[in-house]
C-alpha cells in the first residue's frame, strides 16, 4: 500500500503547530517529515493524524510531550493487538466452519 502525503505547511496551519514544536516532535521520532523532488516538505497522512493526537493531548489534556509519546506507543500496541485478535478470530471461525462443514469465504 502506498502512503499518502500532505503538504506540511497546510498541516501546520490546520493544527496551529509552529516549526519549533514540529522539530521537537520529529526529534523524538514521533513523526517523520519527508521532502519531494521539488524540496517541498510533506508528512504522511498517518503521521499527520499522530501529530493531531499529540496536539490534542498536549493542549486539551495538559499532557507533556513525553506523556504523549507513551500514549501513542500504547495506542499503537493496542491497535496491533486488535489486528492480531481479529486474525485469530478469523482463523478460528474458518476452522470451525471447516470442522462442521459450513461455507467458507
Locate the predicted segments by residue.
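Arg/Lys-rich, alpha-helical DNA-contact motif
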Residues: 2-9, 13, 23, 27-28, ...
Amino acid at each position: 500500500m502506498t502512503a499518502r502525503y500532505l503538504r506540511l505547511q497546510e498541516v501546520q496551519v490546520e493544527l496551529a503547530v509552529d516549526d519549533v514544536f514540529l522539530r521537537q516532535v520529529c526529534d523524538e521520532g514521533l513523526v517523520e517529515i519527508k521532502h519531494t523532488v521539488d524540496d517541498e516538505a510533506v508528512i504522511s497522512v498517518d503521521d499527520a493524524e499522530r501529530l493531531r493526537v499529540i496536539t490534542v493531548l498536549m493542549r486539551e489534556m495538559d499532557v507533556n510531550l513525553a506523556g504523549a509519546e507513551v500514549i501513542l506507543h500504547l495506542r499503537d500496541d493496542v491497535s496491533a493487538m486488535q489486528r492480531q485478535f481479529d486474525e485469530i478470530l478469523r482463523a478460528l471461525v474458518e476452522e470451525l466452519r471447516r470442522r462442521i462443514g459450513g461455507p467458507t469465504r
